Amino acid sequence: MAFRIPFAQSFWQEYLSGQEANLPRLPEVEQVTETVMRILGGNPGRMQLQGTNTYLVGTGKFRILIDTGQGEASWIEALTKQLEANGLEISHVLLTHWHGDHTGGVPDLITYNPELSSRVYKNTPDLGQQAIHDGQKFHVEGATIRAVFTPGHAFDHMCFLLEEENALFTGDNVLGHGYSVVEDLGTYMTSLTRMADLNCALGYPAHGTRIEDLPAKMKEYIQHKESRMRQVLAALERSRARMTATGGGRRAGALTFPELINSMYGGIPDEIEQALTPFLSQVLWKLAEDRKVGFEGEPSQRRWFAVGPPAATAVRL
């Protein structure tokens, strides 16, 4: 079994802290379009930006709820206030993925309305939840939502396509500000391509403001990840070139995680190195899957090296 450094949100707090700066203020509740109402989860932070976006979707009495926030009292209060003031009911609860800032409000929902216990849908559902399948459709007045399986940020991640607006609820795969973190970069890149191929005009992210030009945002995300992969590969190729010049063999210039980080960024504090290591791990495994890098040694002392011709001179077949 391949060794990968486990995803740990605490390591990413430093990495994401810059995304907090200069974030636009979002109202607690906003009728974004005739069909979509956004209700903030009341959980702002480095990982959650202004807080988790939850969405009531539809134009009639019955609405579809996408995500449930983290379980903050302010969220369930804001949601139930909107339901009761407008005579609304929830027909389905759709969860984008398993992370607690998206599923944490489910118990409060069921306390508010026990009938909702049989209307909670998630890919790879927990006990008592209903399964979501790729391509499955959910209907209420004014809204037809199609589920799109897009793993990578999380193994069970789903996006939801709102047909009436040609809009995509992007979950945590694509954010309104900055970039997301991932569990599996190779799978995530495949999902980004699938999302881009849907050609949706607008994006409703799980964190941040509405994405007004989703095709441009998808292109930006894909290019950003590809750029990081090129940077890592270039660092390994530079190390190989230096060692080959002194008579090294096929695995010349192999580097450990700390050595690679030092090669790319120089001396950095330990906490920043910890923040970079999970992301770097995902990049290296993606490059290994693409057969651009190899590795040797036991997991705790694994060393990585470039294989094949340098990227700048590689022959395209």
Curated annotation (Swiss-Prot):
One of the GO biological process terms: secondary metabolite biosynthetic process
Positions with a binding annotation for Zn(2+) 1: H97, H99
Origin: domain of life: Eukaryota
Binding positions (Zn(2+) 2): D101, H102
Entry GO MF terms: hydrolase activity; metal ion binding
Pathway: Secondary metabolite biosynthesis
Disulfide feature: none
Needed cofactors: Zn(2+)
Keyword Hydrolase recorded: yes
InterPro entries according to UniProt: LACTB2-like_MBL-fold, Metallo-B-lactamas, RibonucZ/Hydroxyglut_hydro, Sec-metab_biosynth-thioest, WH-like_DNA-bd_sf
Recorded catalytic activity of this chain's protein: 3-(2,4-dioxopentyl)-2,3,6,8,9-pentahydroxy-1-oxo-1,2,3,4-tetrahydroanthracene-2-carboxyl-[ACP] = 2-acetyl-3,4a,8,10,11,12a-hexahydroxy-1,4,4a,5,12,12a-hexahydrotetracene-1,12-dione + holo-[ACP] + H(+)
EC number: 3.1.-.-
Entries under Pfam families matching the protein: Lactamase_B
Active-site annotation: D101 (proton donor/acceptor)
Keywords: Hydrolase, Metal-binding, Zinc
Details of cofactor binding: Binds 2 Zn(2+) ions per subunit.
Enzyme class, spelled out: hydrolase
Entry similarity comment: Belongs to the metallo-beta-lactamase superfamily.
Function field: Lactamase-like protein; part of the gene cluster that mediates the biosynthesis of the linear tetracyclic TAN-1612 neuropeptide Y receptor antagonist. The decaketide backbone of TAN-1612 is synthesized by the non-reducing polyketide synthase adaA via condensation of one acetyl-CoA starter unit with 9 malonyl-CoA units. The FAD-dependent monooxygenase adaC then performs hydroxylation at C2 while the polaketide chain is still attached to the NRPKS adaA.
Name by which UniProt lists this protein: Lactamase-like protein adaB
Annotated source species: Aspergillus niger (strain ATCC MYA-4892 / CBS 513.88 / FGSC A1513)
